[in-house]
Amino acid sequence: MFVVVYWWRVKPGKEAQFREAWRRGTREIARIYGGLGSRLHREADGRFVAMAEWPDRETWQRAYDAKMIYDDKEARAMFVDAIAEVPPDNAPAFMMEVTDDLLGLNVANPPQSD
């Protein structure tokens, strides 16, 4: 699995709009390009940070090269309208191969070790 981390600063008062647009866009990207989904977080400094999961780097690269364009033009316009700042060149903050995955770990009933 391959994970890509993105961040954005959102214009004050546009947070709900951004989140709706992000959800809609993420669903479209998964449907069209084969992404596995994403989680959106809010940093203490106010930035929104997304961790997007992909089956592999090649699948992500094809989507990235295609600029992840999707048909929901309204969602895309909402997203762009809400953005105040992006990283230089709109580049991902991190691109990582997953080595160990305990994200779905049930801490109430942990698996038994061998």
Locations of regions flagged by a protein language model:
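Short amphipathic
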Residues: 7, 94-100
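Generic structural motif
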Residues: 11-13, 57, 101
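C-terminal/domain-terminus segments
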Residues: 101-114
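Short, well-ordered beta-strand segments in beta-rich or mixed alpha/beta enzyme
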Residues: 2-9, 37-67, 108
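An amphipathic, aromatic/His-enriched active-site/gating alpha helix that lines ligand/cofactor pockets
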Residues: 24-36, 53-95, 111-113
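Short, surface-exposed ligand-recognition loops at beta-strand->loop->(often short) alpha-helix junctions
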Residues: 9-20
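Polar low-complexity intrinsically disordered regions enriched in Ser/Thr and small residues
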Residues: 16, 28, 37-38, 107
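Short, low-complexity N-terminal intrinsically disordered segments enriched in polar/charged residues
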Residues: 16-17, 42, 111-114
